[in-house]
Amino acid sequence: MPQLTKNYIDTGKVSIEIHDFPLTQIHSGALMAAQAANCSAEQGQFFLMRKTLFDGVVNKEWRDGSLDDLTTFGNYAAAIGIDRAQFESCVTTNRHLAQVKADLAMAQQLGINSTPAFIINGRLLMGAQPYDEFAKIIDAMISPP
């Protein structure tokens, strides 16, 4: 992703939108984690929290969306410089739940059933892909006819 960001997003050639697709059938706490990432965005730390959440699930630091997970997410927030009280209030009041659920419904309508998934100008690209695959598709779309 850093190379894509540098060559396409930072140069203004393309823009990026990130939508939630919490895999609750695998991680029952994924819905809370998606909300935690969005609550972190309110304080300018979306990407760092997102990485922290992914690292945390891999390390089995959280799992089921319980109060223990909320405590873990609050610890993550504090560690990356987020106001913990504001963050926890955002998560516990489900401030972003409607948007997360709307993103999930949109993904399901598009036939997305796993992550990662990418939509590039209407074209669905499933699974992790090398930089060259993204570059080939993007270059074909932005090149003059």
Enumerate the predicted regions with their spans:
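Structural alpha/beta surface segment adjacent to cysteine/selenocysteine redox centers
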Residues: M1-A78, L110, D139-P145
